[in-house]
Amino acid sequence: MEHTASLPGYVREKLAELDLELSEGDITQKGYEKKRAKLLQPFLKKPEGDKVKSTPPPPYYNVKNANNSTNHGNINNDGVIVSSEGYSYVTEVPSLSSSQQRHSKKIDFHQQAAMSLSSAPQSGNAGAPGYENMRPQGGAVGDPGYQNTREPSAFQNQQSTNNSQHRQRRTQRKVTHNEKRYHSEVRQEAVQQALAALKGRPKPSLPMPSKRTSVLNRSPGCNDELDSSTDDESIPEETISPDKEYNYPRDHISNSILPPEPIIKPPIRESSMGSQQHARTDVKQNQITNQKYTAPNSAPERRPPQNLPPLPTSEPLSSDYPPIAYKRENDFSDKAFKQKQYNAPDITQFNNAHRAADRVTRYVNVSQNELNETDANGKWKVSAKIQQLLNTLKRPKRRPLPEFYEDNDIELEIAANTKDPNAPKPEGSTMTPVQGEQLSIPAGLPRTLECALQRYGTNSFKSPMATVLDPNGKVTTTLTYGKLLSRAQKIAHALSTKIFSKGPEQVTLKPGDRVALVYPNNDPLSFITAWYGCMFRGLVPLPIELPLSSSDTPPQQVGFLLSSCGITVALTSEACLKGLPKSTTTGEIAKLKGWPRLQWFVTEHLPKPPKEFNVGNLRADDSAAAYIEYTTDKEGSVMGVTVTRAAMINHCRALTMACHYTEGETIVCVLDFKREVGLWHSVLTSVLNGMHVIFIPYALMKLRPSSWMQLITKHRASCCLVKSRDLHWGLLATKDHKDISLSSLRMLLVADGANPWSLSSCDQFLSVFQAKGLRSDAICPCASSSEVFTVSLRRPGRGSCGFSPSATGRGVLSMAALSHGVVRVDSEDSLTSLTLQDCGQVMPAAQMVVVRSEGPPVLCKTDQVGEICVTSGSTSASYFGLDGMTNSTFKVQPLLEELEQPKDGNGTVNIISKPIGEDFYVRSGLLGFLGPGGLVFVCGSRDGLMTVTGRKHNADDIIATVLAVEPMRFIYRGRIAVFSIKVLRDERVCVIAEQRPDCSEEESFQWMSRVLQAVDSIHQVGIYCLALVPPNHLPKTPLGGIHLCEARRRFLEGSLHPANVLMCPHTCVTNLPKPRELHQGVQTAAKLSSSSGCGITDTGVGPASVMVGNLVQGNRLAEAHGRDVGLAEDCERKPQLITGVLRWRANTSPDHIIFTLLNSKGAIAKTLTCSELHKRAEKIAALLQERGRIEPGDHVALIFPPGLDLLCAFYGCLYLGAIPITIRPPHPQNLNTTLPTVRMIVDVSKSGIVLSIQPIIKLLKSREAATSIDPKTWPPILDIDDNPKRKYAGIATVSFDSSAYLDFSVSTCGRLSGVNITHRSLSSLCASLKLACELYPSRHVALCLDPYCGLGFVMWTLIGVYSGHHSILIAPYEVEANPSLWLSTLSQHRVRDTFCSYGVIELCTKALSNSIPSLKQRNIDLRCVRTCVVVAEERPRVQLTQQFCKLFQALGLNTRCVSTSFGCRVNPAICVQGASSAESAQVYVDMRALRNNRVALVERGAPNSLCVIESGKLLPGVKVIIANPETKGHCGDSHLGEIWVQAPHNANGYFTIYGDETDYNDHFNAKLVTGATSELYARTGYLGFLRRTECSQSASLLDETTPSVASRDSDTESLNSISQLQLNFSNVSLGGNSEHSLVGGASNANDQELHDAVYVVGAVDEVISLRGMNYHPIDIENSVMRCHKKIAECAVFTWTNLLVVVVELDGNESEALDLVPLVTNTVLEDHQLIVGVVVVVDPGVVPINSRGEKQRMHLRDGFLADQLDPIYVAYNM
């Protein structure tokens, strides 16, 4: 058994380095394990004796006695003792290295348990003066909230022995990437108390998201093969027989046996252990009292959940998951750690053979074991999870929704920024400007920087100016003042003589030109020489970072800055030039994205300047620019801050005075020397004073965090420039502390002293290093900004300046008051206090005020937080090239508000503001206030401020709280980004953290739920999104910090790739519109109506709709007619039997080719003439009669692929008088889902016989088919190619009112229905279509659609025979094989009319988008096409048709010819664009009015506008009205309601097997309750509206002449709202009814100015009712599709009032979690709905029917039955 303490020193150092590499992410977990095992190999062979047993637990565990109970201690295998609450208290990273933590099980359990039985914990500071132990003693002793401040008495006597070990062990502490982030211990305690307080409340468990196994394997360190979505309440218990033993990977046992506070229940099995095992480690589960966390209704004696990864079982996994081998990781002990009796995982979900992603048929394959998944409660796994989510949401919220329902944005805005009447108000007097001391320039200080360099370079040329350390910590090169001077002169001379070619012209650099300085962070010496070279030449340097690696931020923002500054030359070093990205072809330096073309100039190896070259004779103006420094704003745009020469030298003088710099001092600099504090001190002020700077590159700091302290000790440095993270890192490097002496240090400048976490790092650093000579007055926090430079600085030594010597201060402030912008002192022990330290006083010669951060710059009150503004001779001058922003930032005149008394004494008191003086102040971007004695307190920055529901929160404060949520072992300390995003008019807080690689799924969720609670209770603000990303995934700044803007940008564009996401919109979003409530009168009407309507309730039959002639209160009633069929020739007027027509055609034109079938190559596969069709039909009739014994009126099922056999079989049945039912054949690749549907239709239609072709008959009887349908149970099956013995006698005579065929189809809601079509309907439908589309024998019509139901069937089989035109048939599956097939056919056969489906349009648009040039080469010309009708039963898909038209316009397609038809179950063709009708009209309606069942017309491009296009033109003989689906009242024009249709070709009722036609009876004979109450209509089941429209022949968009209605009109107004439109349309006033104006159709052009357009909005059954409003899924889906380019398809449905969004991810599985926040944001923003569940699935999972419509109900069933195999399921809280 090894303790690292017993290892030799060199091994310990190597181990520490390894740990550091792992924590930095420089080495993989696997490589780490390997190297570590190798290192420890020689020391592992020592025998383990009794001494092991007596090893005390390491002193960094806060061992607590669990309520003095006599249980055997709740001990994790890590030795982490657990209190009865189920917390584990571990300091953030114990000094044991992480892997040791994970692998070593050193302490015998009984031994440790015995220790934990010691008496109640008492106070005592354990161990070395570690920085974790800083909490002041005292306070609530029994509180479980402290980390490591108290140890049980059992440890007191061991302390002395442990101290040395403790110190040694700290050497292995992980040093994490803690870029300037550091947490306050006070906060830590507050967080723990807050969490403890919350713990008392019974908490419903939040469901944990489900991840697919492969995603789990990808996410850091998770080998748990967790079931895709399981939940412990709904899983049958199973046990493994005790003889099976499994070896667990060690980290699983250690990390997951303890469920720390199961707020979120992980998806795990219930354990089923016998009590006999309590002596084993399993004891710990039973100790954790489970009562507190189970949902309130569960009995306390439930077994606690067993938090272990499921074990591998012998069941085979499906083909896509390789069997998992659980291998043990390197083990230090030889004993195998065996565990018995855990449950086998449920792998049933993957047992089905791998499903092909076939959309059309996806989810009926529930294998047997899945059916048994439901337990006694009968709940599905998913449903249990959603139940949990619902219970969570039922919890009363702290902030109720404001009570209002409003459509418009102003109200949403007001709701987002509520004013709290109880908010504290500032009470102090108005502040006065604070003056810094007078600037006294020491005698002999050089006049300018150039003079300084010349003086020191000649007089003391050997004294060192700068030294840089190499990555090993050795001093490599020192730059003396002499060398600096000569090199800078060389550069200045070279730059003045070098000629750069800028395109054709030659240019030299003139004084005042701007150049870029591009140097790596480890080469300050070249940077300084180049900087002073530019100074000597009068050039303006702009130092920039060079992103060398792809993980850095995109450099294009910097490129914009370079372009705007007009920079063409970049100075760089040779080494840096070599590292620049080169172009592969030319080998030259590649042009970076967004960058201008640069000339690179290397500043080394330059010739000596000639004797006469004198740098001193350049006299630059003081107001000229000296340099430009880049800075970024909140949104991430990069700006250049221009600094004048006067400001630069003044600032150096002020720093010299404030810091008491003298010549020859040594400074150590850890900061970035290219900008801000690092640049001002180490490059500029140091040269002015002739000081020596030692630079420590960031790479060395990562490797040896204490190197800066060692340098101070070695060089006796007097000043040091650091950030608080360097103090923190230095504290952790305890092994180096013994040799350090900081007594020479007079100033330790903390550059980010303004951050809330800097206070505790300063305090702890001082407490540890005071013993090493550090003086308390040496620590100098300062505040700075690029605009103001140094805002304030605590003076070193304190005594010499004019302020009181003891001028340091700290304030304990109330965070709640700060969020309202007010300073209030809080008590020390308050949970919600923030402790701030001062940032010193105002700089010499500067004047400071604090002004309001919003609105005009009015002076703040003394107790008010505002933005700090400074005026002095040493601030920046402007943002380069941005005049507007410059004026608002650099030219601020603070205003003083005064009350003006009215003259006559009785008027109102006015507030007037006047400037306090002439001076212009500069905004610093820092928020704060001035304390007593002129001390400056900074409590945030303008960029880090988040205003959530009217209260201000500082990102840094939230980071501090997040960091204090222990245990920190789940995430990396400093790698946290907090920012806000604007969603639904308010800012929402997002927290992104980097997760450690060894953190399991449950642990990270445990941690996330604690963070939510901590932030909520301390800041009273909800976190909207909390995400964990894999290690090193947050974008970095060049010095290793987090690049916040870039992280935010990636988050918003969906390229951050988080490993875990928790969204909490339900608790954060409090400004949703109030749900609508029904009016009283309407509710009763709604109750009376029996229909399953969609909840349209606001047009009840009431006084508003009193009938006035044919108008409702001046508004037309919604009614429209197609033209009269009577205008056609006489033969069309009387109905004809289709069989008679066919026989007539066979006699009169026997050789006329009537059908042509094409194959996938576009070649003619088969043709049929009229006589061939007639003969084959006769033959099939004979076959049916002879072999099938079919009588007239019998039902025959036709199962054929799209083709000519289907036609012949159909007419064969009609000849016989039998009733055919066409059925789509089953899909050979997907039999087990498609075959049951086929069988169902055969059964439901009562077909006595099946007619088909040989391949399909074989398929029906195959072995594969037998698994789902027994082949013996089919009715008799006939082969169409069999020959009958006799000829068929004669065509049966049937009546017009007998059934011709049954039309079966499955609706999008999954309802299978068959409608009965009589011969009369069939004949009138054909007549109507023939008339509208002008079809006659010489026409060619191309059809590319499915011939099984609706209009597709009519076009394919009936209309060609009726009108005799030539039909060119293309089966849609052929187009999948050859996407250009349909278009090339149109071109080749010069087709004028074509009918297709949306599936075909989509396929062409997607597959051919890049092939237009090649199609042109093949001479494909679409100018011949006159009408292209998309056959659909839904709202026309405007976007898709527009894309299609735009794409193929290039091939001559006239965009006006594409239109959509509308048909439905009750009538297959209501609207079809005719041959001579005008193009479809578009209108824009307000989406928010639509969801309240109103139609409000708006202009194109208006917010919330939705483009709706009319569905073709009404067919001749069709009459359509709009009725309220609930009340059956007649609606007015432009009102939303159900479309009712009256036509001779309506279907004649449903044919259903169950005979329950009661419910659907009124679908075919509905009557209005107002108006013409005697007429019968068929109800289409679709919502829509009618609108009188001008037939514009030109512009398809809303014409300027159409007045738009105000986008909102209330329920009562909407009746009148459209009436003003009528004034424009003279026809309306002439003849109120549209019949007169439309009679004559095309014949009379004057009459065709107006027509009634039918606009379909969506199916009644599909409407989603949420929060009292009605949404159409397509609208939500369109929003979701737009939110990320990787979303291939999307479908939404509701389940128990939760909105579920399913998105198909067309990309890498690692991108799945990017979609969750984006989907949630988009739906909130566009529809004001909160998404409850986001399911990310593979492409092809959303099922789609043959018409290209989504089967949302199938999808829902598949989701609830857990058959989707999702990549990720996120449950939004």
From Swiss-Prot:
Keywords: Cell membrane, Developmental protein, Membrane, Neurogenesis, Phosphoprotein. It is found in: Cell membrane. CDD domains: Dip2 (cd05905). Its main location: membrane. It holds the Pfam family DMAP_binding. Residues 3-110 form the DMAP1-binding domain. Residues 224-236 have a biased composition (Acidic residues). InterPro entries: AMP-bd_C, AMP-bd_C_sf, AMP-dep_synth/lig_dom, ANL_N_sf, Dip2-like_dom, DMAP1-bd. Disruption phenotype: Mushroom body lobe defects including ectopic axon bifurcations and/or axon guidance defects. RNAi-mediated knockdown results in an increase in the number of mushroom body lobes as well as ectopic lobes and guidance defects. Expressed in the developing nervous system. Ubiquitously expressed in the developing brain. Within the mushroom body, a higher level is detected in the core of lobes and peduncle in the late third instar larva. Detected in whole mushroom body neuron structures at 48 hours after puparium formation and during later stages. GO terms for molecular function: acetate-CoA ligase activity. One of its GO terms (cellular component) is plasma membrane. Residues 166-175 have a biased composition (Basic residues). Residues 113-125, 146-165, 272-297 have a biased composition (Polar residues). PROSITE patterns: DMAP1_BIND. Interacts with Disco. This is Disco-interacting protein 2. It comes from Drosophila melanogaster. The gene is DIP2.
